[in-house]
């Protein structure tokens, strides 16, 4: 979340920067809340000082043998008033904090202003889309013909936007995840991590899914007096980043680099009618996530590095893609700067998102109280957090099926995956 102090001292400038990403900050309401907070703060401090002074006089009066019953009653009355003001102040601070928790991150100055994805900037492009001398099929037709993608069974078992994979396509899907993890751990310096698929509310608050995006989650257990509710993770970013929640990291341990392959679960609220065909938008999907925890001065360079790590997967698989710098109006809630990787899908004759790599700066760290000890003054300071897909496994499978298809409907296995496929070079 944004620094509440910054909201108070730089309210107009903050509102202007947030407006560039289509968010209207109610400055009048916040100003009113701040004035009330100041007033309550003064009243609370004055009542506290008065009670302390009078309490001190009780001991002096007792030493003189005086009756202190009237003073005791006065202290009790002041205590009641003080408790009431403290409760009022706490309620107000909660309201201010809720606004801060529901306000998106400030865009970095290097992010182009724009209203939506049409104003994103292409940074670079790799590979040349293949020219086919036969009619191109989409991944759904290819996968069903091969007997590897079974949507009908998934609908029967669960419902729409789920998949059953079989045989060599299931193996290819597994091979992709293994290849990605090996690349990131052996060449890019990430620590492979196994994490829970269920997380509590504090974790979702820490990474920014709550309170604003609760409808996008699959909630499995409601909150009770015994404990917090549990929800399925929408991305491994949540458990990986929360590894440093309420922690002071030694500067010598930075950067921290985590990767995990997990199933991810999203309700896709608001996406009705979009990408209803095939694997592009599923309620359950596999993803290899990359997370970096770094010092503030290192985070922008870390974003470039993390993005290149995700790009390397596409390059080794021989999949054409382009790298897009998102404009202010298209960035995610917690991001300060984001690159999207878009892979070429010949059946759609367009590039589609396959990875999103973001620098959150201290937005998540402030929520999580994730800190490191600054060597300059030996005091705890907020870390910066970054995350990205390296990659979405299902969408990578889609890209391979479409880009490596042959005229007879078979699929050529990319060279880098042969060892993960037991030497299989052709599916079909």
Curated annotation (Swiss-Prot):
Record-linked PROSITE patterns: AA_TRNA_LIGASE_II
EC number: 6.1.1.11
Positions of L-serine binding: 235-237, 289, 389
UniProt entry tagged with the keyword Iron-sulfur: no
GO process annotations (BP): selenocysteine biosynthetic process; seryl-tRNA aminoacylation
Recorded catalytic activity of this chain's protein: tRNA(Ser) + L-serine + ATP = L-seryl-tRNA(Ser) + AMP + diphosphate + H(+); tRNA(Sec) + L-serine + ATP = L-seryl-tRNA(Sec) + AMP + diphosphate + H(+)
UniProt subcellular location: Cytoplasm
Keyword Hydrolase (UniProt): no
Enzyme class: ligase
Gene3D superfamilies, per the entry: Bira Bifunctional Protein, Domain 2, Serine-tRNA synthetase, tRNA binding domain
Pathway per the UniProt entry: Aminoacyl-tRNA biosynthesis; selenocysteinyl-tRNA(Sec) biosynthesis; L-seryl-tRNA(Sec) from L-serine and tRNA(Sec): step 1/1
Pfam families cross-referenced by the UniProt entry: Seryl_tRNA_N (PF02403), tRNA-synt_2b (PF00587)
GO CC, one annotated term: cytoplasm
Signal peptide: none
Keywords attached to this entry: Aminoacyl-tRNA synthetase, ATP-binding, Cytoplasm, Ligase, Nucleotide-binding, Protein biosynthesis
Domain of life: Bacteria
Gene Ontology MF term list: ATP binding; serine-tRNA ligase activity
Binding-site residues, ATP: 266-268, 353-356
Record's comment describing the protein's domains: Consists of two distinct domains, a catalytic core and a N-terminal extension that is involved in tRNA binding.
Function recorded in the entry: Catalyzes the attachment of serine to tRNA(Ser). Is also able to aminoacylate tRNA(Sec) with serine, to form the misacylated tRNA L-seryl-tRNA(Sec), which will be further converted into selenocysteinyl-tRNA(Sec).
Subunit structure: Homodimer. The tRNA molecule binds across the dimer.
Protein family per UniProt: Belongs to the class-II aminoacyl-tRNA synthetase family. Type-1 seryl-tRNA synthetase subfamily.
UniProt protein name: Serine--tRNA ligase
Origin species: Shewanella denitrificans (strain OS217 / ATCC BAA-1090 / DSM 15013)
């Amino acid at each position: 979340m944004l620094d509440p102090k910054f909201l108070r001292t730089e309210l107009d400038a903050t509102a202007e920067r947030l407006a560039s990403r289509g968010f209207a900050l109610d400055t009048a309401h916040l100003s009113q809340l701040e004035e009330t907070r100041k007033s309550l703060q003064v009243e609370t401090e004055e009542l506290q000082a008065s009670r302390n002074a009078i309490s001190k006089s009780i001991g002096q009066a007792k030493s003189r043998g005086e009756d202190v019953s009237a003073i005791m009653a006065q202290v009790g009355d002041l205590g009641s008033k003080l408790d009431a003001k403290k409760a009022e102040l706490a309620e107000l601070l909660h309201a201010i904090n809720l606004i801060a928790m529901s306000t998106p991150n400030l865009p970095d100055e290097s992010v182009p202003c724009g209203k939506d994805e049409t104003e994103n900037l292409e940074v670079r492009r790799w590979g040349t889309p293949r020219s086919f001398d036969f009619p191109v099929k989409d991944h759904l037709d290819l996968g069903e013909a091969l007997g590897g993608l079974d949507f009908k069974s998934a609908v029967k078992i669960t419902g729409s936007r789920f998949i059953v994979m079989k045989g060599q396509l299931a193996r290819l899907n597994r091979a992709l995840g293994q290849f990605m993890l090996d690349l990131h751990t052996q060449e890019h310096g990430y620590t492979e991590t196994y994490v829970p698929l269920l997380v509590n509310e504090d974790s979702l608050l820490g990474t920014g899914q709550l309170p604003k995006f609760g409808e996008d989650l699959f909630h499995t257990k409601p909150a009770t007096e015994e404990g917090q509710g549990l929800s399925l993770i929408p991305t491994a970013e949540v458990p990986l980043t929360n590894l440093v929640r309420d922690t002071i990291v030694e500067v010598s341990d930075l950067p921290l680099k985590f990767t995990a392959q997990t199933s991810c679960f999203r309700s896709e609220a608001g996406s009705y009618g979009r990408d209803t065909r095939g694997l592009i938008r599923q309620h359950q999907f596999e993803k290899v996530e990359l997370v970096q925890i770094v010092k503030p001065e290192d985070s922008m360079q870390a974003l470039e590095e993390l993005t290149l790590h995700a790009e390397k997967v596409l390059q080794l698989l021989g999949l054409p893609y382009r790298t897009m710098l998102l404009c202010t109006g298209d960035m995610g809630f917690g991001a300060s700067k984001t690159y999207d990787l878009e892979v070429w899908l010949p059946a759609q004759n367009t590039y589609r998102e396959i990875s999103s790599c973001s620098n959150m700066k201290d937005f998540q760290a402030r929520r999580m109280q994730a800190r490191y000890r600054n060597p300059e003054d030996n005091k705890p300071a907020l870390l910066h957090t970054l995350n990205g897909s390296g990659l979405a496994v299902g969408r990578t499978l889609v890209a391979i099926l479409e880009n490596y298809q042959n005229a007879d409907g078979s699929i050529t296995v990319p060279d880098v995956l042969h060892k993960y496929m037991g030497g299989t070079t052709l599916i079909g």
